Amino acid sequence: MNSYFSLSASQQRTLITQTAVRLGLPEQAVEKDLWVSIILQLVFTLPFSDKLVFKGGTSLSKSFGLIERFSEDIDLVVDRSFFDLHGDLTKKQIKGLRKKSSLFVRDDLTNLLKAAMVSYGLDEYCSVVPEDDGEGDHTYPEPRKIDVYYRTLFPLNEYLQPRVMLEIGARSLFEPTVNTSIQSLVTTQFPQIDTGLVSAHSIATAAPQKTFLEKTFLLHELFTSQRGISAERKSRHLYDLEKMMDVPFAIQAIEDDHLWGTIAHHREVFTSLSGVDYTPDIRDRIVLCPPEEVRSVWERDYSDMQQSMIYGASLPFDALLERISLLEKKFHDR
């Protein structure tokens, strides 16, 4: 097996271009996926990796192959037991957790990631930049982002910047998880090319049924508290749900009272939004489709995603909403 990093820049460019042609994706998307894969593997070699869980939409594609949109960022959760906090927390404790987590990401995680980059010779390709502190109540952003800027081989694409964003927080629900492994799109198309720098590591990953229910909860919160005014990069949740809704784990998750109750309780305690009533069972009245007055904005965002991020089949927007309406009804009628 040949290492991607033993190839010349010209050979790397050709390899990414051939992968992009096979998958019907922009070259910049394939290149970004490669760096997402490398950085994710690298993070799970760090000393505290046993306290991390990989979650979100990128896990659905990279770990489970449930969706066919390329990976853009890396969402991670730190087990709050790492900060000696357990169970339900008071508002004061949650505020303290946010500060501890934010400082940990800004200082410890960033410095260890930089050191790992140097150790594996990636510092000549990448730079690691943590999110700046804010002001006032937002001095310590949580989750806090880390941007990894990589040296691109291709012309700049406005929608696909040469940057991998890690978003790391400690308030998300940590379990249930499963162990997975990941590989880049380049390696899936050219198995003889190894794009990893580290040995295959088991990556603790949020179980897909949890991600499925959390995405439904997120859309309900968006459409009931904010009326879905901001659609930028959010239509992916509609796409993800449509892709998962007929898979057995999703069908079972809709009726899983225990898992739903755990997620609902956790969101109410740790990440509640004003304007959302968490008390009765939200499944009875869940809203998953954008309101009519903002539907065109969501359609534009979905069109952008189809062109730049999806490498498999995807429905027209109207057909997508028909399917999501059906999913909404399944929750109501369970």
Give the ranges of each region predicted by the language model.
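Betabetaalpha-Me/HNH-type nuclease active-site subdomain
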Residues: S61
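Glycine-rich beta-strand-to-loop/alpha-helix junction loops that act as flexible
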Residues: F54-T58
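Structured mid-to-C-terminal alpha-helical surface segments
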Residues: M1-L52, F64-E68, I74, R80-R334
